[in-house]
C-alpha cells in the first residue's frame, strides 16, 4: 500500500505555506516556504527563469510521468500611487465581491521583507485593467508611509483549523500547494514505479501567466501529463466534505480524457479503501489546466471544494475561504494513487471488458434483416 502522511503533518505543512502573505507578482514568501518544506523532507528543488519552484520524485521505470501544478498567488491589492500614508491600490486578480464593503481591513507588505502594517481600503472605483485581471481601484490609508509597488492582503487568518474545517486567507491556491507538497513527501521511499514532477507557479490570478510561460517555454517534460491542483468554488455536485473533485473541465475548456484516466484508476482504488472522491465539470472559474490544454499539452485537474471562493462572503463582502481537512487528505491519497497508476500505465477495471466488442454481438449486428 502506498505511503500516507499523517493529518498533523499535513496541517503543519499547510500552516507553513499559508502563513506568508501573497499576491500576483509578489509570491516570494510562499515560494520560500514551499522550498523549505520540500528540502526539509529531502526533496531537492530548482527555480526557473520566472521564479517558479520545481521539484521531482521518482523510482523505477515509470511508464508515464505526471506533473502536478498549483499557483502560489491569490487575489490581492497593489499600491499604485503613494503620498505619505495615503494612496491608491489596484485589485490584482479576481475579487468580484457583490458588495465592496465601505472599509476593508488589509495588511501592507513589501517584497524585500519589511515589517507589515495595517491599512484600510475605501472608495472603490470601477477601473478595468485586463492585463492584471483587475476591475477596481481603491483609496488606501495606512498606519505607516506607503510606497508604490507594495502589496496588501486581506486582514484574515492565514489558516485556522476547527475540526474538519480550515478557514484561510488564501486557500486558493495555497491549500493546493500544500496538497502537492504532501504528495511528494508521501512518495518518498515508494518502490513502485512513479515519476512525479511539481511546479509551483506565479501570477495565475491575473492571467494564468506562470503556467502559460511554463507551457510556452517547455519548462516541463513534454510527454508528461499535467494535473492542475486547485481550491475551486464549491458547487452542487462538488461539495465540501465529500472528497477531492476530479475536474473534467473548467469555465472555458474540457480537459483531456486520457490524462484523467489515471485519476479514475486512483478513484477506484480509493473507493476500495473507503476514501471518498467526486467528479464534476467545475465552471466556477478557469484553472491552469486550460493553459496547458490550449497550448497542446495533455492535461486535467483536481480541486478542493472551496467555500467563500475568492473570499466572497454570503453578505457580498469579504470572508475567509474554507476547505475541509478530509477533502485535503482525499486529494493527497488521490495524487499518490494517480502517480502509481501512471507508473504502470493502468486502466480502469471495467475497460478490458468493453475495449473490444464481443464477437457474438458483432456477428448478430451483421445479420441481414429478416424477410417477411
Please identify what each model-predicted range represents.
Residues 1-372:
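N-terminal hydrophobic/helix-forming segments and targeting peptides
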